[in-house]
Amino acid sequence: MKRLGIFFFYEKNGDVDEFITYYLADLAKNLTELVVVCNGKLSAQGRAAFSQFTGNIIVRENKGLDVWAYKTALDSYGWEKLSEFDEIVMTNSTLMGPVRPLQEMFDAMAENQDLDFWGLSLHHGAKSNPFKGKHIYNYLPVHIQSHFIVYRQRFVQSPELQQYWDNMPMIADYNDSVQRYEAVFTKQFEDRGFKWDVYVKTDDLKDFTDYPLLVCPTKLLREKKCPLFKRRSFMHTLEAYLNDTAGEPVQELYAYLRDETDYPLDLIWKNMIRTMHPHEFTRNLRLTRIIPPTVQNKAQAEEIRANRKIALAMHLYFMDMLDQSMAFAAKFPPETDVFISTNEPGKKAEIEKAFAALPLHSVTVTVVENRGRDVGAFLCDLAPQLRGYDYACFMHDKKAIQTKPGSVGASFGYVCNENVCKNAAHVLNVLCEFENDPYLGILCPPFPAHGLYFMNMCSGGWGPNFENTKKLLKETLKLDVPIAGEESPIAPYGSVFWFRPKALAPLFDHGWQHTDFPPEPLPQDGTISHAIERVYPFVAQAAGYYPAAVMSRDYAVTRNDTMQAYATGMIRPLARVFDCTTFWGASGAATGFAAKRHLFGTYGPYANSRRRHARNWLRDNLPESAYKGIITTKRAIFGPHHGPYED
């Protein structure tokens, strides 16, 4: 069979990850020719990667999205030459795999020669249309998903298809692409008498979900022999998953790939860490570490103690907290090297005397300039001593003296210490976590959720620090990883955390000086220190690692109960704030669960058709200036306040 493949690719820097070449290596076995169409840039690395499979590489302006990329490829051949192929395969880099040979799919579909076009998977449509913009239909039709669609020869030769592509208008954005192409293509040509089908049959799931490949990918891969899965699975918002599931699809998918296939998991990790927000993939994959109070693998713990270099870095300022700091250090294995900074010679002598009683490998105390507090001491004086260590922990004697009542600040310190260093077994278990996961770069305690800290947590943990963190990351450190105000950083608020020194090397190597930090008195927020506190996870990501939260098992129970209490107490007030009509709907619900369901039905990313319809109606019927005024006011009051978003 003479088969042409058209592969669409977009990546902002034009870099081609290995998951793409893995996919193309199998796809190319089933093709006679391959053309790659790149929107925007294609790096030298990317060109070399694609050149393994074809010399026909088109790099075009980044406009028109996938639709115009495909159109460009079709136009480059012309209909006469395209008509010589038995099949034309159009696919793109939103898919990962395969987990089984693609030939199985091509052979199976070749048995049905009555089809004019076919695809990999189906979207079952919806009674309403959730996408904004001008709608061809007031509902979402059942359709072949555009990530993999195949045209047969007689379909390519048909005037209808040729006119469709010849007259395709420029595509403005994602919603325009869906409305003019993906969601309507199947129905438009079915209505004209053309026959179609999909390889992965999911008619039995149409009452289960409208999007099987995203909501139940494991079922499709295991039971329906689907060879491919969505890259989006790992970065899809957890809130969207929670509209349809308990959040389990991605964890199940990963377990299936790990335990039942030969698919190289490194291909997923490398792409996630390079291109995705850890806030999304760490939640979807349940990467938060819950640490038990007893050692789980004694043999491994002993091996780590014998063969790995372990360091504890501490900044000690408050001598009335020295006993607490010693108790923290006493939980570390005796092979640990401890590096301590303080601001006065008298304090140094007191610390050295106290720590001499602890069974540690070495203790080094340094007097440093009292500028930049714990963050300045860590980067300027302690970090240079940590090069060459495998695993390290940083802590300081935290006193949130500006927080009233004092119990709120003290509990912040409890959250940090309880989850980073609950006991000696906790420390060994954390070391095993790093040993078992080569991509783990940082483990941070969770953001405090009590007192006034709760509202900061609800705002994503940025406070007034998004712009200064972004500037530090992009301009000062010149690191290129995803950062957005709508994505919460998995950061060590309180500056107590575990890390691999290699993961923070781009930050450590900057050459920090105490003059980089403002003198006392420091503002309560918005300083370079607060930006550094939030930049740690992004630095680790740029170095090829990911950050995750860590909790002791006891605190995880507390955290769960805390979140349950907040959810119960806030659902109705939130409903009143967001939308009066929603409030009355929620207040009429018989239970808290029903109220939650009502709110998610209105505000959930997929089940929010009423909200989307209202927004679309406003956009379509109001003057542009009036519509923008309404949306601007809404965003100013209720958010979202940062980054790309939909209302």
Where is each model-derived feature located?
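ER/Golgi luminal nucleotide-sugar-dependent glycosyltransferases, focusing on the catalytic module
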Residues: 1-647
